């Protein structure tokens, strides 16, 4: 016969788990709202700096700046943005799977590429598989500031300028909605596909467009990294909220099934006791 105490223990254990996942769902929901606001608030800045950079670059075609110039590719860098923690559904696995597939398709040797990792899960994945992780940052807050990733962003740009690698791709999860995100690949460097300014505004540059590009181009590339991080953080919180909601729903279903099983077992035990009592009474007559 089914052990009633064991079933009761499983019910209580599942209820405790449900309380935890429900709390995590609510926390992630709160973090998502703020992360989504941060990502949206950053868009106007990105659009404006892109306009300015595009305007300067279109007027200085022969600047020869290394960030604007394509060169023969001997080594490629992949900047991969993930999270420090799990329990976020396919948030990390989907992006890691895509990056790994890309590496397998594009490269025959590990000497042809390097990894820059944002997030402990990303770093540990590539280190465990013996990929060359040349820079990483972990322990980011839920609402990161530019200062949190300034070092790795500047390293990424600086190593391209210095010739450590010849092109840089960035991978992150683009936030679509609270229930959807998509793995996005963006070629970060060289900046060979800068669009002309979207507005008809004209700019006058002092001391010169080339001098301003020298300062603005690294800042622009670094801001793209930060914008992708904000986008990725919104996706992370959304994925974790969805995962915890699914876990909570599954716990509720399991509690219902176990409760039904418990009641049936209890009813069977009572029926058996009555049968034994009746049988014993009949034997005494």
From Swiss-Prot:
The keyword Ion transport applies. InterPro entries: ATP_synth_F1_ATPase_gsu (IPR035968), ATP_synth_F1_gsu (IPR000131), ATP_synth_F1_gsu_CS (IPR023632). It is found in: Cell membrane. GO terms for molecular function: ATP binding; proton-transporting ATP synthase activity, rotational mechanism. It comes from the Bacteria. Gene3D superfamilies: 3.40.1380.10, ATP synthase, gamma subunit, helix hairpin domain. One of its GO terms (cellular component) is proton-transporting ATP synthase complex. PROSITE patterns: ATPASE_GAMMA. The keyword rRNA-binding does not apply. Keywords: ATP synthesis, Cell membrane, CF(1), Hydrogen ion transport, Ion transport, Membrane, Transport. GO terms for biological process: proton motive force-driven plasma membrane ATP synthesis. It is a peripheral membrane protein. Belongs to the ATPase gamma chain family. Produces ATP from ADP in the presence of a proton gradient across the membrane. The gamma chain is believed to be important in regulating ATPase activity and the flow of protons through the CF(0) complex. F-type ATPases have 2 components, CF(1) - the catalytic core - and CF(0) - the membrane proton channel. CF(1) has five subunits: alpha(3), beta(3), gamma(1), delta(1), epsilon(1). CF(0) has three main subunits: a, b and c. PANTHER family: ATP SYNTHASE GAMMA CHAIN, ATP SYNTHASE SUBUNIT GAMMA, MITOCHONDRIAL. This is ATP synthase gamma chain. The gene is atpG.
């Amino acid at each position: 016969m089914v052990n009633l105490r064991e079933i009761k223990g499983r019910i209580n254990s599942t209820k405790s788990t449900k309380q935890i996942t429900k709390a995590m769902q609510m926390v992630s929901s709160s973090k998502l709202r703020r992360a989504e606001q941060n990502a949206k608030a950053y868009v106007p800045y990105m659009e404006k700096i892109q306009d300015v950079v595009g305007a300067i670059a279109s007027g200085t075609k022969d600047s020869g700046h290394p960030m604007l110039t394509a060169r023969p590719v001997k080594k490629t860098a992949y900047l991969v943005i993930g999270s420090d923690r799990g329990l976020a559904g396919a948030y990390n696995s989907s992006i890691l799977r895509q990056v790994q597939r890309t590496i397998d398709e594009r490269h025959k040797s590990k000497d042809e590429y390097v990894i820059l990792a944002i997030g402990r899960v990303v770093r540990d994945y590539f280190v465990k598989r013996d990929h060359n992780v040349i820079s990483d940052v972990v322990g980011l807050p839920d609402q990161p500031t530019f200062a949190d990733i300034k070092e790795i962003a500047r390293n990424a740009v600086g190593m391209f300028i210095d010739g450590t690698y010849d092109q840089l791709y960035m991978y992150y999860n683009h936030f679509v909605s609270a229930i959807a995100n998509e793995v996005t690949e963006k070629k970060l460097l060289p900046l060979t596909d800068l669009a002309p300014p979207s507005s008809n505004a004209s700019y006058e540059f002092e001391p010169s467009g080339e001098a301003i590009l020298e300062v603005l181009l690294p800042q622009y590339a670094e801001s793209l990294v930060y914008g992708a991080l904000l986008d990725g953080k919104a996706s992370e919180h959304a994925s974790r909220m969805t995962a915890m909601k699914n876990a909570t729903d599954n716990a509720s279903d399991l509690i219902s099934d176990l409760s039904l099983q418990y009641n049936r077992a209890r009813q069977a035990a009572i029926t058996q006791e009555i049968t034994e009592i009746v049988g014993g009474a009949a034997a005494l007559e």
